Amino acid sequence: MPTSNTNNYSDAMVTPLILIPGLMCDHSVWSPLLPLLPHQQIQIADHGDSESLVDMAHRLLKNAPPRFDMAGHSMGGRVALEVYRLAPERVRRIALMNTGYLPLADGEAGLKERAGRMQLLAIAQSQGVRTMGTQWVQHMVAPARLKDVVLINAITDMFERKTATVFERQQHALLNRLDASDVLTRIHVPCLVMTGEHDAWADVAQHRAMADLLPAKTEVYVIANAGHMLTMEEPAAVAQVFLNWLN
């Protein structure tokens, strides 16, 4: 698990913050945020060749310090919930961003999700990850940002650093995800719940449903002018919420 923010703060002074990327994402999804969190000891999780969320959680715990804060984006939020399920005593704070908690739905809804994921995988396997990413990203950012060439290229470049095999493994992990409702009801540490105003993948209502399951009353932060990739779209707004949560 690479360290991404070097500073002079010891473990005794600053609890490490582990940032967990989502599907086909890496350090770049968090990079715009890092300069805005200068006093945090930050590590970024790497899912490697894992093909289940539970395995990703075990991998994170194996490389993590004894106590830590963690923030998970998208699939990374689901990994964060599995980390808390496995080792709640090691988690000091948790942030859930642009994510979900329910398993694959039964019936038509589940079949539709599976078909959509398999269609993207087929494109990645037959035409390449970048071609897939170019189509996928159209639903990943706020509509006003679709013409932001720098942003769109940064996202598709990030996707392209992963292979179609990694995409297949991570899609398998998401299609076989556990129901984390029970985990949410047992979270007794400060929890941040956040999504983008225009997130078409993990909308505001889904995050309010998550917040309602938490034992403590929890506000849902909705980042204006952002979609699913809010850390890359509106890093300053995200950082301000993060700093309030961490402090």
Question: Language-model features: where?
Answer:
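Conserved alpha/beta-hydrolase catalytic His-Asp/Glu region
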Residues: 108-109, 127-185
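Gly/Ala-rich beta-loop-alpha elbow adjacent to hydrolase catalytic centers
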Residues: 72-76, 80
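Flexible "cap/lid" loop of the alpha/beta hydrolase fold
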Residues: 85-86, 90-127, 131-134
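Short beta-strand/loop motif that positions the catalytic acidic residue
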Residues: 187, 193-195, 199
